[in-house]
Amino acid sequence: MEQLTPRETVRELDRYIVGQNQAKRAVAIALRNRYRRSLLPEGMQEEVLPKNILMIGPTGVGKTEIARRLAKLVRAPFLKVEATKFTEVGYVGRDVESIVRDLVEISLRMVKAEKMEEVEIQAAQAAEKRLEALLVPGKRQENNSSNPFQFLFNQGQEKEETVTPEIERDRTFIRERLHRGELDEQVIEVEVEDNQPLLPDFLGTGMEINTNLQDMMAGMLPKKRHKRKVTVREARRILTTEEAQKLIDHDEAVQEAIRRVEQEGMVFLDEIDKIAGRDGASGPDVSRGGVQRDILPIVEGSTINTKYGPVKTDHILFIAAGAFHVAKPSDLIPELQGRFPIRVELESLSIEDFQRILTEPQSSLIKQYSALLETEGIKVEFTENAIDELAKVAYEVNSNTENIGARRLHTIVERVLEELSFEASELPEDYTVTINREYIQHRLGNIVRNQDLSRYIL
């Protein structure tokens, strides 16, 4: 875990997210407390539990982005889920324990990627040797196996390879050509593992019992392989990945993945206000309280069985978020409310915020669109009054219709640049376009003035 101070964390988040200092401070403190906890004696570490955070604010103000950027910052296992996807145990749908199972899978992918980077040089060397053997195959001698069961798994005929001095000489010549990149575009045939499921998805996507059956069958039967025609460049990548997989210790990777989930895992529970049932609820609201009660043990700490082993959730940091337009945080069951002691209210965006969102972040909307059009040789320049006008229009449309926060800017900028994006490929090279207030008013004038139109178009 990176040892960032709360101030450094907020400064990093400022590069991507405008405003919302209270929310940034809350997550920065939660992150620093994790590092502080890691320095405590082992007995004390178990006692210090994370203080989960509840973010309250309208859509498009930065709730999800804060959590996502924070996880990237510390390279922690991070999972974003919508609370509305889950149903009470006994109903059709995903059960809440799949949160932990998915988090372990994400963590394992991260750990394996890191470990594969460590063995990249050895894997590349082994892949190069396999490439040479594919381009200059040795003499093969069939070795008929006496084991009848091997025929079931297409392994009845193992082939031994004999490398003669002539073949070795040819491979040396090919090796030099491979290093020079002369054969990168040549098409060859390679054997790759078949990633198709062994069983059809007869219970529906995401159903846990189906996933468990797939894993069980995968463990019983050997992996099927099939032949693919690819370029040497692509074959090198495929073979390097396969060789790296062989070099890493799978059990060690699993242990490290589980440790990271237990000690550094982060879960972002979005739309939590949608499962906050009102008193006397009926119909579709019936199972909402059940989902809350199912989430409760995971948030307060329990042991979940996964295919990689048991995972304790006591020290996973949960960040819940919701607009709470209809329901209130007090509509959540009291036990769940108590598990989110830190409440942060995110402010709605002002005109000044919109101006900053358009220009300040590292990958702001204006920079993105300018870079896209620059690929066609079109230089787009936005004047200051154009930025002011875009911010003003976004604020007005949000005020008069649904408030969707910063996402409104995507719709407006897309509308402003629609004609230019369409004609860009036909314009001459080094063409410069200046976007000013008049240009924006010309493109959006009638739509902004007519509320009925802006409801449907912006």
From Swiss-Prot:
GO molecular function: ATP binding; ATP hydrolysis activity; peptidase activity; proteasome-activating activity
Keyword terms: ATP-binding, Chaperone, Cytoplasm, Nucleotide-binding, Stress response
Annotated positions binding ATP: V18, G60, V61, G62, K63, T64, E65, D270, E335, R407
Domain of life: Bacteria
Pfam families: AAA, AAA_2, ClpB_D2-small
Keyword Chaperone carried by entry: yes
One of the protein's GO biological processes: protein unfolding
Matches recorded under SUPFAM superfamilies: P-loop containing nucleoside triphosphate hydrolases
Keyword set includes Electron transport: no
Assembly and interaction partners: A double ring-shaped homohexamer of HslV is capped on each side by a ring-shaped HslU homohexamer. The assembly of the HslU/HslV complex is dependent on binding of ATP.
NCBIfam families: hslU, PRK05201.1
Job of this protein: ATPase subunit of a proteasome-like degradation complex; this subunit has chaperone activity. The binding of ATP and its subsequent hydrolysis by HslU are essential for unfolding of protein substrates subsequently hydrolyzed by HslV. HslU recognizes the N-terminal part of its protein substrates and unfolds these before they are guided to HslV for hydrolysis.
Protein name: ATP-dependent protease ATPase subunit HslU
Organism phylogeny: Bacteria, Bacillati, Bacillota, Clostridia, Eubacteriales
